[in-house]
C-alpha cells in the first residue's frame, strides 16, 4: 500500500476486517503494518506467506495420547469461526474435559468485541474451576 491511510481504506470493507471495532482496527493499521524501506509505502509486519507456513508446518499430534492440562482451561470460540463448524470445541471437551463457550462474531471476535471479550475473560478467571 502507498500509505497506512490507503491500507485502511482498502482493508476496512474486506470480510476479515469489516467487523473490527474502530479502535482495534486503528491499532491494527498502526501496528500490523510497517514502513517498506525498499518500495516505499507500508506492508504487513508479518508477511502473508509466513502466516501460511506457520499453519502448514504446524504438526498435529491430536491422535496421540495426551495429558490433560494441569491448570484450569476454558476455551472460547467464535460463533462464525472455522473451529465450531469443524466441531473442534466438542472434541477438546471430550478429550481433555475442557469446557467451551461460543462467543458472537467471527474468527477475530476479540477484535470485533474487545470490551465484551475482556469482561468474559475476567469472569472466567475469577470463576473457580
Language-model segments: residues:
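C-terminal alpha-helix
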Residues: 120-128
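Catalytic histidine-centered segment of alpha/beta-hydrolase-like enzymes
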Residues: 105-118
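Short alpha-helical functional segments enriched in proximate histidine and acidic residues
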Residues: 10, 108, 124
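Conserved serine/cysteine hydrolase catalytic core
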Residues: 22-23, 30-95, 101
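Helix-rich cap/lid subdomain of alpha/beta-hydrolase
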Residues: 1-39
Amino acid at each position: 500500500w502507498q500509505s497506512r491511510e490507503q491500507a485502511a481504506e482498502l482493508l476496512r470493507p474486506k470480510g476479515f476486517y469489516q467487523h473490527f471495532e474502530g479502535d482495534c482496527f486503528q491499532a491494527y493499521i498502526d501496528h500490523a503494518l510497517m514502513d517498506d524501506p525498499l518500495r516505499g509505502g507500508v506492508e504487513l509486519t508479518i508477511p502473508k506467506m509466513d502466516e501460511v507456513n506457520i499453519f502448514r508446518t504446524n504438526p498435529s499430534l491430536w491422535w496421540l495420547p495426551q495429558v490433560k492440562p494441569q491448570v484450569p482451561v476454558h476455551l472460547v470460540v467464535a460463533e462464525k469461526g472455522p473451529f465450531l463448524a469443524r466441531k473442534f470445541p466438542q472434541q477438546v471437551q471430550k478429550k481433555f474435559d475442557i469446557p467451551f463457550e461460543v462467543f458472537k462474531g467471527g474468527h477475530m471476535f476479540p477484535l470485533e468485541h474487545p470490551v465484551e471479550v475482556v469482561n468474559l475473560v475476567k469472569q472466567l478467571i475469577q470463576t473457580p474451576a
